[in-house]
Amino acid sequence: MSDSKEQRVQPLGLLEEDPTTSGIRLFPRDFQFQQTHGHKSSTGCLGHGPLVLQLLSFTLLAGFLVAILVQVYKGPSSLSQEQSEQDVIYQNLTQLKAAVGELSEKSKLQEIYQELTQLKAAVGELPEKSRLQEIYQELTRLKAAVGELPENSRLQEIYQELTQLKAAVGELPEKSKQQEIYQELTRLKAAVGELPEKSKQQEIYQELTRLKAAVGELPEKSKQQEIYQELTRLKAAVGELPDQSKQQQIYQELTDLKTAFERLCCRCPKDWTFFQGNCYFISNSQRNWHDSVTACQEVGAQLVVIKSAEEQNFLQLQSSRSNRFTWMGLSDLNQEGTWQWVDGSPLSSSFQRYWNSGEPNNSGDEDCAEFSGSGWNDNRCNVDNYWICKKPTACFRDE
């Protein structure tokens, strides 16, 4: 029995070889069956053991062959992928090399550096920004332009004037005068560009004459000192002016004085009230808006047209004192929402603030304006109200 067991086990040893193609080591010993412990013998099972192991070995070998074939077929595709990536890298390197080849040569870079150096030196030598330098440059260009013009007695005279003006400008002391002359020169330059016409020459000559007069009026240094002292004294005097409240008080006193003077010279008819050069009549009876307009016209006046905030405050006070609703000369009869005075003038936007809250609301065809409480209200024009007429004062001497 021992010899037969050795003969059965011997073929299994052949399966211990290492398959090089797969790289996996298989040990079939691990698959040998262990004899089970029990009361019965396992001789029947061992009789079929070699056949099962052979079938299992063939199955594993077939799996290894399939794996090897898959790797063989996959190899060329991965190689082609690596090749394509190398091609892309090569193309990028080629493009980069071409771009580097297009860069400026060293001599070009040197040339650019020299240009920059020269430019830096030139910028460093630029003169400081001054109005006199600009004027001098303008005069130089202007002189060149005039020098190229056809010979003419008037042009020659202009050239001489410019020469003298150039000398005078070089000694200009005042910045304000420099600015004035610079502006004149700017206009003169524009005119010289259009010189061919005789009328333009005449215009330039007149400009030069005025410019020469302006230069001639520049004060000497001694005069400048005197003017400076005068300005200093004036500044001190301005500093001593009364404060704003004092100024307001003085203004009010002057206003009162003017009003008193007007009353002495100008009078209003009986039962009329004077205010700021006008006479106002406040009715004691009531009429509708249209009849109120007619009543004012009959006495040579107008249903009141308000021209200022002061006048509005004065009239509003007169109306509120008597607690009356009073017509004014304002309506939107011609076009709804467009308010207009009886003299044809439109209602100023600054006067919109005088409407009472929520007014005008056109509630029931309300097209005429009235003084109501502390502001204005729109009401139906056929309602009877008091009214105010306005006309200018008549100034005369007592008989």
Swiss-Prot record:
Gene Ontology BP term (one): adaptive immune response
Domain C-type lectin positions: 274-390
Cytoplasmic compartment residues: 1-49
Sequence ranges of the Sequence repeats: 108-130, 131-153, 154-176, 177-199, 200-222, 223-245, 246-268
Glycosylated residues (UniProt): 92, 361
Quaternary structure (record): Homotetramer.
Name of protein: C-type lectin domain family 4 member M
Organism: Nomascus concolor
